Amino acid sequence: MNKDTKEHKRLEEHYSKKKDWLKWGPYLSERQWGTVREDYSPNGDAWNYLPHDHARSRTYRWGEDGMAGISDRYCNICFAVALWNGKDPILKERLFGLTGPQGNHGEDVKELYYYLENTPSHSYMKHLYKYPQNEFPYDELVAENQKRGKHDLEYQLLDTGIFDNDEYFDVFTEYAKAEGEDLLVKISICNRGRKMAPVSVLPTLWIRNFWSFLGMNKKPIIKREGGKQSQYVSIDHEYVGKYNLYFDKPSRLLFTENETNMERVFNGTNEHPFKKDLFHDAIIENDFSVAEKNMHGTKCAPVYELEIEPGETKTIKLRLTKNAVNSPLGTSFDSVFSKRIKESQSFLETVTEKSSEEQREIQKQAFAGLLWTKQYYNYEIEQWLKGDPGTSPPQERWQGRNSNWKTFRNHDILSMPDAWEYPWFAAWDSAFHCVTFSMVDHEFAKKQLLLFTKEWYMAANGQIPAYEWNFSDVNPPVQAWAAIQIYQMEQRKTGKGDLSFLKRMFNKLALNFTWWVNREDSSNNNVFEGGFLGLDNIGVFDRSNGVPGGGVLEQVDGTSWMALYCLNMLEMALEIAKEDDSFEDMCLKYFGHFVFIAEALNKISEGSSSSWDEQEGFFYDKLILPNGESFPIKVRSISGLLSLTAVLNIRKETLEKLPRFKSSLAWYRKYRMENMKYQVIEEYAPDKDVLLSLVPRERMTILMQSILNESEFLGDYGIRSLSKAHEKPYNIQIDGDNYGIKYEPAESTTDMFGGNSNWRGPIWMPMNYLFISTFKEYHNYFEDDLKFAYPSESGTDLNLKEIGFEISKRLIAIFAKDTNGNRPVNAIHQEKYTDEHFKELILFYEYFDGNNGRGLGAAHQTGWTALVANLIEEINR
């Protein structure tokens, strides 16, 4: 791969600390309102404490938000785009969506916007927002969705008909960096309608408010320089120094303060009229007498009152720079943009060199979404609990949400699952994000993964915080798996893996592994139980709220995740031990632990049943009641298939370098044979690779037949999360109450976990990626000695590598055009997405309909759904 592109050089300059190319980026959140961080209510009602209607008038404490925005890495100075079509009741400063309680399937953004391009250094970025020319249907979206139930489709913006006559603007926002602190901005507004339409554009610059909460030696200021006809403002900020913002000549220039309108929000008194929502008042009421009075403030916007003819595009240029520039918007401006666009294309081509044109477009937008959703995230639990000077948060907080995480304190750039729907980190999501990040920026991927092991994130007992709604929830421990993936990707592309990174991850994850063992294996039988494991509603009851009847649920997925964790730690230790033989002892530790887990899952002990059902050929959760009675929960879900993912092929070359470990393997096998114990290593020869698998080959074969059965798990677009066999519902009675589950290929029909995700049939990209990686690992050992009919009963036998390839193609097909030019992801709105100005736009949803591939859940989850970019790279490798 050509690593001599300008973008590669920028990354090298940044990570070698020669230049700071990442000081500025798309770090501005898309939604700060309705978050846990901004919630100071006594009952933890985050959605209603600071709702969308307050956001324009109320100062945030822990961050900022806006549309197509940027900030410096600590969110001191922010820039974003605001719009008004002359008809809306509010100035469009931020994206609108429904709260969790408002939506019939939980929270949901109700806007059309797309991440088109982004480079890892953010040297070039492009964003598209589609803004209706008629009044935005705020009330209609809320009212109609509240009428709908869990069994109904969500009412989306396209369903309102507001785009039917193409009466909308395409608003393209582009950024190009001349240098790390010299950002060029271009806002292009195109009228897609058939008649002239007016629009007011407010490129808005503002300063995050610290002075109202923490106090500052000197309040920052934005002020107009050079008199009333000048076209630039200066920023003076004690934390980041001085900047200038240059801009095309506006219709007018407005200033106000980024401070709460106490009168509007709290029925209080304002000491002056310059409040956060002043631009809204001025624009909507067409009264600029106050907003134009001052030539300084902490929030500023040049206003461009445009009239745009049909098909016409008007462009606004701005430049935010650390240094004074002569002719800032002149020919050099266009030259920089032209260079950065070409460099972005060149970088993309090196990363996707073997992809087809269509595949490259999918990858480009997947990378763009991943990079656009890097966000500044600030949350200091102890400060949040006790409040700022002059404030008195309710005492209930000290016993409420996250109150036992007082050591958590961060202000970092983190990868968000979705910058509007999930504008907070989720530990296991982030691990998957990093695997795709590693395709474009190895260093960011490694640093991001390491962050979660830092002492200001990880608790002293080794627990990794889950997500802000409840840091104490438990998510699948996939950090070690991701670390190995990233290490191997870098090794494959550069010829050398980062052993220091691997060691650092290993040492901290050893603490986390111990926490898992101590917390989740209460019976000390190596079968793991209890808690929420990230697959929200996959069980017959909410697993995070305890077990009905006071029993214990021995979870096959919990046990499988721990077995996978064991093997990931073993693989890391093996790699490190090749350079540092002191790690051989850790190899033995994790191998031994894996042996006991494998034995426990397949056969716990004499007189005790395993999780495996011989008659049905599946692993099931087991419910143990207080009276000792136990029975399986016979749900055929990916929980029962996860046992396949715990597999490791240890190369004979590795074993030759580690003689103590090799002899221990032989001893273990001999000892267990002599004592009639469960054989973990089925096939063993001193001169061959060694396969460690949680499930024996016979059971693995049976499970594979279920996976590849199109009447069960194999859908046209990937592996389903629940067997289609459950079209006939499964029901069970526990302690006098009835519980059930059925195949639901689309949205959730339950309120479990807010009801905005569904693991009862849809296709999830991260789990599919994990299975495909698993198939490759098995193939590395068996090669052509193990084949399966694909699909089952097809009569066509493929090896496991080929099967992974074919399933990858099904997943990629979700986003690709079919012979009619339709993308399955757009199943409901196909007609609109064949339109000239929609057809190349791709959304990367949270999960996908198990029958037709339709996108579901969060619409911009290019967090883990960006893994499709990895799949494309892998099938072309």
Feature locations, PLM:
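Transition-metal
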Residues: 64-65
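Short, surface-exposed loop and linker segments with low hydrophobicity and enrichment for Pro/Ser/Thr
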Residues: 73-75
